[in-house]
Regions:
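Outer-membrane beta-barrel architecture
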Residues: 1, 12, 64-68, 137-139, ...
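Structural signature of Gram-negative outer-membrane beta-barrels, strongest in the C-terminal barrel
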Residues: 1-17, 131, 137
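Residues that define the transmembrane beta-barrel architecture of outer-membrane proteins
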Residues: 5, 57-63, 130-134, 173-177, ...
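Transmembrane beta-strands of outer-membrane beta-barrel proteins
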Residues: 7-11, 79-85, 136, 145-149, ...
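Gram-negative outer-membrane beta-barrel transporters
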Residues: 15, 36-158
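C-terminal beta-signal and adjacent terminal beta-strands/loops
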Residues: 152-161, 183-270
Length: 270
C-alpha cells in the first residue's frame, strides 16, 4: 500500500511595475488656479495635502515561500500534529516627487514676489509595503478536536511621505500571537470554540524619522554626532544620518493599542 504525502511546499518569485501611483505629496503652491478648477483669488494659496499620480514608475519584486505539513508518520496521537509557515520578502523602489517653493523678488515694472514650484525627486520604499512578512501556525487535530497557535510578523512599513526627511513616517515591526480552539460536541453540528487574539498585547507604533531634543529619553550623543558630521562635510546626507539613529530614539507619531481579546461560545453548523 502506498501512502500519499501530506506535505505542501511552494516557492515563487514575483515582480511588479506600477504606473501612476496615487499618493499624498504634501504641500503645493497654486500657481495657476485654473489648472485645479479654483477661483482666481486662490493664486499663491497653499494646498496642504496635495494628492497626485506619480509620473515615475514604481518597481517591486520579491519571493514567497510556503510550507505546510501534517505529521502523519509519527506514532500514535502525535499523528495529529500540523505545521504551516509562510515567508515573504519584498523589495521596492519608488521615486517620489518633491516640490520646493522658490521665491523670486522683482522690482520692475513693479515690486512683486513670485512663487514657483520646483520639482525634484527622492527615492524610498513603496508606501504601506513591509519588507518582510512571516506567518506560522502549530496545531493539533484529533477526532472532533482542532487547535491552532499562530504568529504573525510584519516588518516596519513606510507609512507617510513628507517634504522634510525627518517628518516621514515608518511603523515599528509588529508581531502578534493568536490561539484558536474548537471541539465538536455530542449533538451533530454543535461546536464549542475559543478564539484568543493578540495574546502578547502587541502595540502598533508609528514613528517619525526625526527625533526630539525635548524627549527626556533621547541620547544627545546622536545629535552631537550629526553636528560633527555636518561641520566636517557639508554634503553629508541627512537621510544617512537619520538612519543611524536607533528606532526607539525617534519621535513617536502615534501608537495604537488593540489589547487582547478572548471569545468563548457555541456554534451550530447546519
Amino acid at each position: 500500500m502506498q501512502r500519499i504525502s501530506k506535505t505542501f511546499h511552494h516557492e515563487s518569485y514575483f515582480k511588479k511595475r506600477i504606473q501612476g501611483l496615487i499618493f499624498s505629496s504634501g504641500q503645493r503652491v497654486i500657481e495657476d488656479p485654473k489648472k485645479y478648477g479654483l477661483p482666481g483669488f486662490t493664486k499663491y494659496y497653499t494646498m496642504n495635502d496635495y494628492k497626485t499620480n506619480n509620473q515615475n514608475a514604481t518597481f517591486l519584486n520579491g519571493i514567497e515561500i510556503d510550507f505546510q505539513t501534517r505529521f502523519w508518520y509519527l506514532p500514535n496521537f502525535l499523528r495529529g500534529l500540523v505545521f504551516n509557515t509562510n515567508y515573504t520578502w519584498i523589495e521596492s523602489k519608488v521615486k517620489y516627487p518633491r516640490t520646493i517653493f522658490e521665491q523670486t523678488i522683482v522690482h520692475e515694472p513693479e515690486f512683486d514676489v513670485l512663487i514657483n514650484n520646483v520639482d525634484s525627486t527622492y527615492i524610498d520604499r513603496l508606501l504601506d509595503q513591509p519588507q518582510e512578512i512571516i506567518n506560522y501556525s502549530i496545531g493539533y487535530d484529533y477526532k472532533g478536536f482542532s487547535g491552532r497557535f499562530s504568529m504573525n510578523y510584519i516588518s516596519n512599513i513606510f507609512s507617510a511621505t513628507n517634504f522634510w526627511t525627518e517628518l516621514r513616517q515608518d511603523t515599528d515591526a509588529y508581531k502578534r500571537y493568536d490561539l484558536s480552539i474548537k471541539q465538536k460536541l455530542f449533538i451533530k453540528g454543535l461546536e464549542l470554540y475559543i478564539n484568543a487574539s493578540n495574546l502578547s498585547e502587541a502595540v502598533d507604533i508609528t514613528r517619525l524619522r526625526g527625533f526630539s531634543l525635548q524627549d527626556s529619553n533621547f541620547d544627545d550623543s546622536y545629535y552631537d554626532y550629526m553636528l560633527d558630521k555636518i561641520h566636517s562635510n557639508e554634503n553629508t546626507s541627512i537621510d544617512e544620518m537619520l538612519n543611524n539613529v536607533p528606532r526607539k530614539q525617534r519621535s513617536k507619531a502615534y501608537e495604537q493599542h488593540y489589547g487582547k481579546t478572548i471569545d468563548l461560545g457555541f456554534r451550530f453548523l447546519f
